[in-house]
From Swiss-Prot:
One record GO biological process: translation
Alphabetized Pfam families for the sequence: Ribosomal_S16 (PF00886)
Entry protein name: Small ribosomal subunit protein bS16
Gene Ontology MF terms in the entry: structural constituent of ribosome
Keyword Membrane among UniProt keywords: no
Keyword Ribonucleoprotein: yes
Species of the source: Fusobacterium nucleatum subsp. nucleatum (strain ATCC 25586 / DSM 15643 / BCRC 10681 / CIP 101130 / JCM 8532 / KCTC 2640 / LMG 13131 / VPI 4355)
Family label: Belongs to the bacterial ribosomal protein bS16 family.
Gene Ontology cellular component annotations, sorted alphabetically: cytoplasm; small ribosomal subunit
């Protein structure tokens, strides 16, 4: 099953994360299928997203982790996905 989840980057005590699409059973920092954005928790929770690609993966059945889903909700992308499901 395909998941949207975070991989850790950055230095010690200065984390940054990539939002990636990868198989559910792969390692946290293993090979990703696609890189979909960045999340910087120490910089006022700055988020950079590739919206069209994320929506495409969600429409095709990729499941976000709890953390990624909360990031998408804050960015307003989850509402767009829910709206597109109703059509």
């Amino acid at each position: 099953m395909l998941k949207l989840r975070l991989t850790r980057l950055g230095d010690k005590k200065r984390p940054s994360y990539r939002i990636v699409a990868m198989e559910a059973l792969s390692k946290r920092d293993g090979g990703a299928i696609a890189y979909l954005g960045n999340y910087f928790p120490l910089e006022d929770s700055k988020v950079v997203l590739k919206e069209e690609e994320i929506l495409n993966y969600l429409k095709n059945g990729a499941q976000p982790t709890r953390t990624v889903k909360s990031i998408l909700v804050k960015a307003g992308l989850w509402a767009k996905f829910e709206e597109s499901k109703k059509k």
